[in-house]
Amino acid sequence: MGQKIHPVGFRLGITQEHQSRWFAEPSRYPELLQEDHKLRQYIEQKLGRLAQNNAGISEVRIERKADQIDLEVRTARPGVVVGRGGQGIEALRTGLQTLLGGNRQIRINVVEVQRVDADAYLIAEFIAQQLERRVSFRRVVRQAIQRAQKAGIQGIKVQVSGRLNGAEIARTEWTREGRVPLHTLRADIDYSYCTAKTVYGILGIKVWVFKGEIIPGQEVATPPPSPRDRDRDRGDRDREPRRRQQQRRRQQFEDRSNEG
């Protein structure tokens, strides 16, 4: 079951949160759901992968309070969203108000993605961009996995489907590094799907990222230390005796100067 079901929907209320957090009267639910879809579609058109200024939008979360809409935009390049002097975010707010009609109160909060190479949607977006430039899919997938491993994840699985490298017959190939426990509910798994439009047709990209297990009472999965951090810690430990020797030499030198 864990292999087939959507990993995020399977864990809603356990380790994952809803992307839309609001309640409404039953008669208004269809209208508000359409509004949410329009908001996300507009932001994707203006700042997404196919836009002129790609801001690397990872996720858009929507909250509603009375007649106010709160948007949390998680992006890899917050400077592109905010713009010079806040002009970009004001233009985005004006466009969204025009889209919804009326003078709606819209508050936009821009959040920077801390680990870009560990975000499933941004990884899938990177692979799609490279495939559209006719780069070999094996090379792109290997590069994306290496970048994700350097970001400190515990496991990743990438699946690409379609006419790979322009083959006559479509096929599906996938690669996995590390652990990706899809059956474990406490596993913090980030999943995303993206499409690449090539001259041979559409390629589908699926990415699963395992960031660690969330223990009850613990909000965020603690990532394991990256090899670079371990090397840095080992280097610090190696440098400590040298520092002590240098301090001892300085003290001895100072003692000699005081005696003289």
UniProtKB/Swiss-Prot annotation:
Q: Molecular function (GO) terms listed?
A: mRNA binding; rRNA binding; structural constituent of ribosome
Per the record, a Pfam family? Answer: KH_2
- GO CC field: cytosolic small ribosomal subunit
Q: Where is the composition biased (Basic and acidic residues)?
A: 227-243, 251-260
Region of interest: Disordered: 218-260
What are the residue boundaries of the KH type-2 domain, all occurrences included? Answer: 39-114
| Annotated InterPro entries | KH_dom, KH_dom-like_a/b, KH_dom_type_2, KH_sf_prok-type, Ribosomal_S3_C_sf, Ribosomal_uS3_bac-typ, Ribosomal_uS3_C, Ribosomal_uS3_CS
- UniProt keyword list: Ribonucleoprotein, Ribosomal protein, RNA-binding, rRNA-binding
Xref: PROSITE patterns? KH_TYPE_2 (PS50823), RIBOSOMAL_S3 (PS00548)
**CDD domains referenced in this protein's UniProt entry, alphabetically:** KH-II_30S_S3
- Cite a single GO BP annotation: translation
Q: What does this protein do?
A: Binds the lower part of the 30S subunit head. Binds mRNA in the 70S ribosome, positioning it for translation.
Q: Show the PANTHER family listed in the entry.
A: 30S/40S RIBOSOMAL PROTEIN S3, SMALL RIBOSOMAL SUBUNIT PROTEIN US3C
* Quaternary context: Part of the 30S ribosomal subunit. Forms a tight complex with proteins S10 and S14.
NCBIfam families linked to this entry:
rpsC_bact
Family membership, please give it: Belongs to the universal ribosomal protein uS3 family.
* Protein name, per record: Small ribosomal subunit protein uS3
Q: Which organism is it from?
A: Nostoc sp. (strain PCC 7120 / SAG 25.82 / UTEX 2576)
